[in-house]
Amino acid sequence: MIKSLEIIKEKTHEECSKLLLKLISNHINEFEKFSIGLSGGTTPELFYKLFAKKYHEYSNITFWTVDERHVDTTEIISNQKMINSIFNDTKLNMIKYDYNEDPRLSAENYTTKVLEKINKFNIAVLGVGDDGHVASLFPNTRALESDKKGFVENEVNILTKWRITSTYQLLADVESLYLFVTGENKKEVIQKIGNEDDLPVNKLIGLRKKTTLLTDQ
């Protein structure tokens, strides 16, 4: 077990979502300005709904997405579209992903926008795929080799050919990083998280001083 991994277990997905909101609220109360990286997928949807219900004003919070499918943010499979639809608030201070036909330019542009607007990466919430991927750092893909701090294009051929993903170096720089992994279908990968398996999630954990896994399994 990687020593820098903290594991918190709750009985249900709902309890995990409520605890995550409590933990992040404690962080938000400590800072005048705050940044939080959000993920797509179905796992964090309840947490986002609870967050939106608790906070009605976001002027001191800057949101960014840890990865994005290489599509316009009006497309149904866009992570930012999903997040914005849940918050249903035009005042949400989300650093917008601008689609360019060239995924490399899209990644470079988002890197510039995020690094210009965020001086300190306070929190990020990440899921973990069945194959151990985090953000869009999938096993056996080129993005795993990047040594830059920012975002890079990554060819994955899952739903879309390309993804734009935060790099290990950016995620390693986040002060408090939560792996939010729930559901019966995640039992197998949860057993591998924090062990010496050659998975992207474990490489990320190894790069950080502390990572928190929140799960119901």
How should each PLM-predicted stretch be described?
Residues E32-A52:
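Glycine-rich N-terminal segment of FAD-binding domains in flavoprotein oxidoreductases
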Residues L38-T43, L126-D130, T182:
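Glycine-rich beta-strand-to-loop/alpha-helix junction loops that act as flexible
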Residues A107, A135-N140, V189-I193:
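A short secondary-structure junction signal
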Residues L50-Y58, N84, P139-D147:
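A glycine- and small-aliphatic-rich helix-loop capping segment at beta-alpha/alpha-beta transitions
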Residues M1-S4, Y58-V125:
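Ligand-binding beta-strand-loop-alpha-helix segment within the catalytic cores
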Residues A124-L126, D130-Q169:
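Class I SAM-dependent methyltransferase SAM-binding "motif I" and its flanking Rossmann-like core
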Residues M1-I36:
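N-terminal glycine-/serine-/threonine-rich phosphate-binding loop
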Residues D173-Q217:
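ATP/nucleoside-binding phosphotransfer catalytic cores, i.e., glycine-rich phosphate-binding loops
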